[in-house]
Amino acid sequence: MDQPGDTTHFGFRDVPLGDKQTLVNGVFHNVAQRYDLMNDLMSAGLHRVWKDATITALNPPRNDTPFALLDVAGGTGDIAFRAAKAAGLGFRATVCDINPDMLAVGHERAIKQHLDHQVSFVEGNAETLAFADRSFDAYTIAFGIRNVPRIDSALREAFRVLKPGGRFLCLEFSTVDVPGLDKIYDLFSFKVIPPLGRAVTGDADSYQYLVESIRKFPKPNAFADMIRDAGFARVTWQVLSGGIVALHSGWRL
């Protein structure tokens, strides 16, 4: 239970724990309309490769077997759409996001891609999911967990809503582990991304927060321990693109 005076980080700032969600909501309200474009620009398109790797790991059934995916912090629908296109007719995805602006963009994209019969959008909080116990075959979260104020609560909720045998997959920015690349990555992150955000979205501060939040996120081994503590078994991870991102996996057995 939260205590008076409890704090957490919002980028490099310490803020009251209860304030972080409101601050994060403001970030994504400001950038929702250009979020997908900025992902392409910031990563030179690599985010598409990383998300495709997530879907390869997910490996949804290609036949009519029913398969229910919960994509949390899925906003504009990238993961859910990729999974739907890779899966068979029994696939259904629920995109859950706390930000209605992101969900609105995602719903419009689903209609344009003729995927609205397979992908639905629900406003909700990762820490208190409004879904029944053991109701999903898989849970994905891509570039969202670091924005959650209470990560341990979100992980416990992920475990709760998964069926036995269900899989948890988390794609998140990580720690660059290639000498030389780390300095280039830091320079690009702090000197290029915020001005780029200002030029494309009119908002540099939101992207300053996003690059700072990456540096505050636990290293892969520490995050793996958090996943285990939530009850998951067979926890593994792989780093991609020299450690720019990590893909964590766990199972509810």
UniProtKB/Swiss-Prot annotation:
Entry's family note: Belongs to the class I-like SAM-binding methyltransferase superfamily. MenG/UbiE family.
Protein residues bound to S-adenosyl-L-methionine: 76, 97, 125-126
Gene (UniProt): ubiE
One Pfam family cited in the UniProt record for this chain: Ubie_methyltran
Matching NCBIfam families: MenG_MenH_UbiE (TIGR01934), PRK00216.1-3 (NF001242)
Protein name: Ubiquinone/menaquinone biosynthesis C-methyltransferase UbiE
General function of this protein: Methyltransferase required for the conversion of demethylmenaquinol (DMKH2) to menaquinol (MKH2) and the conversion of 2-polyprenyl-6-methoxy-1,4-benzoquinol (DDMQH2) to 2-polyprenyl-3-methyl-6-methoxy-1,4-benzoquinol (DMQH2).
An annotated GO BP: menaquinone biosynthetic process
Keywords: Menaquinone biosynthesis, Methyltransferase, S-adenosyl-L-methionine, Transferase, Ubiquinone biosynthesis
Broad enzyme group: transferase
Catalyzed reactions per annotation: a 2-demethylmenaquinol + S-adenosyl-L-methionine = a menaquinol + S-adenosyl-L-homocysteine + H(+); a 2-methoxy-6-(all-trans-polyprenyl)benzene-1,4-diol + S-adenosyl-L-methionine = a 5-methoxy-2-methyl-3-(all-trans-polyprenyl)benzene-1,4-diol + S-adenosyl-L-homocysteine + H(+)
GO molecular function: 2-methoxy-6-polyprenyl-1,4-benzoquinol methyltransferase activity; demethylmenaquinone methyltransferase activity
Pathway membership, UniProt: Quinol/quinone metabolism; menaquinone biosynthesis; menaquinol from 1,4-dihydroxy-2-naphthoate: step 2/2; Cofactor biosynthesis; ubiquinone biosynthesis
Documented EC number(s): 2.1.1.163, 2.1.1.201
Originating species: Nitrobacter hamburgensis (strain DSM 10229 / NCIMB 13809 / X14)
InterPro entries cross-referenced by the UniProt entry: SAM-dependent_MTases_sf, UbiE/COQ5_MeTrFase, UbiE/COQ5_MeTrFase_CS
